[in-house]
């Protein structure tokens, strides 16, 4: 389904490679977390979590849509709801950073609907967490970020974002 929405083969290849790495990481986290999760859903949703990138404007990614990058989660939700995948759609919307609160959106003046976009289910949280490890930057996709790099990136948006990360690490026995 991912290919259906990408006109540029370079953009498709970048997003597919990134999404495959996120899916593999999410499946490994789910397996080690000893929790009851839907592994099939995790793989499917992780592979589709960045489908909204097809509609953003980012020439370095080979995308020439109209929306800014931050909108790719909401756009992905729209796409997947249209495809009849409402649960997968919520992963798209809720995977940005460790999630966006309505307050984050308002305070940062983001071009997004002012609503809660934080991962709620364990599967959503695992995919969101796994996504933090990988960039979509061409030439840098396979490089896995360290937890210190992830923490530094999240700190730019407030200490409360690092608290969420640390809570997940503790919950999953990874701290």
Task: Show where each model-derived region lies.
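Amphipathic alpha-helical segments within well-ordered protein domains
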Residues: 2-3, 23, 27, 76-81, ...
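Charged phosphate-binding loop/patch that engages nucleotide di/tri-phosphates or the phosphate backbone
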Residues: 152-175
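Divalent metal-dependent catalytic cores for phosphoryl transfer on phosphate-bearing substrates
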Residues: 7, 35-147
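A short, charge-rich alpha-helical start-of-domain segment used by transcription regulators
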Residues: 13-17
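Short amphipathic alpha-helical segments
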Residues: 19-24, 45, 49
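Generic N-terminal amphipathic, Lys/Arg-enriched alpha-helix
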Residues: 1-12
């Amino acid at each position: 389904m991912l290919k259906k929405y990408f006109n540029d083969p370079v953009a498709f290849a970048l997003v597919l490679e990134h999404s495959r790495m996120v899916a593999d990481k999410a499946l490994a986290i789910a397996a080690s977390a000893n929790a009851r999760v839907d592994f099939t859903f995790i793989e499917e949703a992780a592979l589709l979590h960045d489908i909204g990138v097809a509609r953003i404007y980012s020439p370095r990614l080979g995308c020439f849509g109209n929306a800014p990058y931050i909108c790719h989660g909401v756009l992905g939700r729209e796409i997947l709801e249209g495809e009849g995948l409402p649960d997968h759609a919520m992963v798209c919307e809720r995977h940005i950073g460790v999630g966006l609160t309505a307050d984050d959106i308002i305070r940062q003046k983001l071009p997004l609907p002012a609503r809660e976009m934080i991962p709620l289910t364990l599967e959503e949280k695992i995919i969101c967490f796994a996504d933090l490890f990988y960039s979509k930057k061409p030439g840098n996709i396979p490089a896995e970020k360290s937890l210190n790099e992830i923490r530094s990136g999240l700190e730019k948006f407030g200490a409360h974002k690092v608290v969420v990360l640390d809570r997940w690490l503790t919950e999953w026995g990874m701290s």
